[in-house]
A protein has these predicted regions:
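A short, conserved structural fragment
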Residues: 70-81
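Short, amphipathic alpha-helical interaction segments positioned at domain boundaries
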Residues: 89-133
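Dynamic helix-loop-helix/coil hinge segments at AAA+ ATPase domain boundaries and subdomain interfaces
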Residues: 128-153
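Conserved ASCE/P-loop NTPase catalytic core
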Residues: 145-313
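Conserved AAA+ ATPase core "coupling" helix
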Residues: 280-283, 323-355
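Conserved AAA+ ATPase small/helical "lid" subdomain
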Residues: 349, 356-412
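C-terminal engagement/docking regions of AAA+ P-loop ATPases
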Residues: 409-438, 449-452
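C-terminal coupling/interaction segments
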Residues: 481-515
Length: 515
């Protein structure tokens, strides 16, 4: 027994023996027969071993139900032997007519679901008194072995997992917020979840391989799966609709929301404040499942209570004031991640090169550090960023291969630095946050284009093009033709006309061209 498979987990394993009869399966006879018949119809002719693989049903249940379907004329054996597992069955005309009605009502084909009652009880057993957790030192050490620095952040993350309370992480871009939060699930014990559950004849999907990583040891009943604590990451794409469980008619299942998929693990709302929907609405939607550890989904309009024992984590590049007091109470622990030290960024850069199995001249490490050292020390004075370290290492690999070299030298590094967009923008002293502001494009008609151009540049305009007796410029969205005309008049620049020709988001391309 260990942290990832304790006595409680072993007891659950013993309880999850594969059912051998319909009563223990806790699914209706009609549901089981309908599932089998849909599989036979979809294949046309199929071997019973394939039906067994798809449904996860015990051979006793499978043989009993297929035999009954055969007797009622819905399917017929077409080949096989004395072994039931090698018999092939085909759908009959009568069976095909029967399947039409079943599939219209419930098109799901797959592993047999678990009953709602069994799901609820098993989850309740696992989540009862889950916190506080005693995390072994070996688990902590293994979890953070590839995390450089940020000792204070590690402590807060550990404490969040011990007591099961939410955490709020904020700070400048590139400081590793998402990365450190992604380590939290490794601190938590695993759990067992159903792949699917049945409620009112409908199927709800719980297991999602995109978020749920299987453990090596699995229960005997294949309808259940033991997973490591999940890490469910949502970002700017998150919307109110995505926080709900929605029906997928193509699969014939209700697909659970991130709130439910994160049960037993971490739900990270990344880039808080960047979502299309108001972040206040999103946070308000999370309050009930965070507080009650349960959420409600609707199946045919009927409310179904499901478990949502997740630890909420929020990250943002914005200020902590983006969350009000009611929301912060659900995430009482906080971490401010400042820009890392130059030495830490260099260490991450070196680690990434080694992970990429790149050989390199040692002098490139000093040159890389020089990018972030202060100008007083002879450096470029750029803001240190863990994200830069990873990206530049990968770009170095690309440049080295493209140049046909065997190792990364200063020349390769210099070219890689010159190709990293954020490093280039910092060198140009361009604030990326300002680039998204709207601009107005003006057509300015003037007799003396040279004098008018200089006056517009002095005003802060960005010259785009000239056409005949006009100049096309970009200015801030708040500038009006009257204000611009008044300014040029005071500069003794004769203007024949000013008109707004477009309003748009400021383009990075134009910013770079104007440098």
């Amino acid at each position: 027994m260990d942290y990832y498979h304790d006595n409680k987990m072993e007891k659950i394993f013993k309880a999850l023996k594969q059912p051998k009869n319909i009563e223990d399966l806790a699914l209706s006879d009609a549901f089981v027969k309908g599932l089998i018949l849909k599989i036979i119809a979809s294949y046309g002719t199929v071997q019973t071993s394939m039906i067994n693989d798809i449904t996860g049903l015990h051979w006793d249940i499978l043989e009993e139900n297929i035999t009954q379907l055969e007797k009622t004329g819905f399917c017929a054996p077409v080949s096989g032997s004395f072994l039931f597992s090698s018999v092939q069955y085909s759908i009959t005309k009568k069976g095909r007519e029967k399947v039409k009605g079943i599939a219209e009502e419930n098109p799901y084909i797959g592993v047999a679901p678990v009953s709602y009652e069994d799901y609820y009880q098993i989850m309740k057993t696992q989540m009862y008194h889950r916190f506080p957790i005693e995390i072994p030192p070996k688990v902590v050490e293994e979890t953070f072995k590839d995390v450089v620095g940020v000792g204070y952040a590690k402590e807060a993350l550990i404490e969040s997992c011990i007591i099961g309370k939410g955490i709020f992480v904020y700070g400048p871009p590139g400081t590793g917020k998402t990365f450190v939060i992604s380590k939290m699930p490794d601190l938590l014990p695993p759990l067992i979840i159903p792949k699917y559950i049945e409620f009112g004849g409908k199927v709800i999907q719980f297991y999602d391989p995109d978020f749920h990583k299987k453990c090596d040891e699995q229960p005997q009943d294949p309808r259940w799966v033991k997973i490591y604590a999940p890490f469910v990451l949502t970002g700017a794409e998150l919307s109110m609709n995505k926080l709900e469980t929605n029906y997928n008619p193509n699969k014939g299942v209700y697909e659970t929301s991130p709130i439910i998929k994160a049960n037993g693990g971490i739900l990270l709302i990344d880039d808080l404040g960047r979502q299309r929907d108001d972040h206040e609405l999103i946070l308000n939607r999370l309050i009930v499942p965070m507080e009650n550890k349960k959420d409600v989904i609707y199946v045919r309009g009927i409310p179904v209570i499901v478990h949502s024992h997740f630890i909420p984590a929020f990250s943002t590049n914005l200020d902590i004031s983006i969350m009000d007091e009611a929301h912060l109470r659900r995430a009482p622990l906080h971490i401010f991640l400042k820009n890392p030290e130059v030495e830490e960024v260099a260490e991450v850069f070196q680690r990434n090169l080694e992970e990429l199995q790149e050989t390199y001249d040692l002098e490139i490490l000093d040159r890389f550090m020089n990018v972030y050292q202060s100008k007083n020390l002879g450096g470029e004075g750029l803001e240190p960023s863990f994200a830069h370290a990873r990206d530049v290492a990968q770009i170095c690999q690309s440049v080295r291969i493209n140049q046909g070299k065997n190792n990364i030298d200063i020349e390769v590094l210099e070219e890689a630095l010159g190709k990293h967009v954020l490093i280039v923008l910092q060198r140009m002293k361009i604030d990326i946050a300002q680039i998204a502001h709207k601009t107005r494009s003006f057509r300015v008609k003037a007799n003396d284009l040279e004098k008018a151009s200089q006056g517009l540049l002095d005003y802060g305009a960005q010259l785009i093009a000239r056409e005949n007796s006009s100049i096309i410029v970009d200015l801030d969205e708040n500038v009006t033709p009257v204000e611009l005309a008044d300014y040029l008049s005071k500069k003794n620049i004769q203007i024949d006309g000013i008109e707004i020709i477009a309003e748009s988001e400021k383009e990075l391309r134009r910013t770079l061209l104007g440098w």
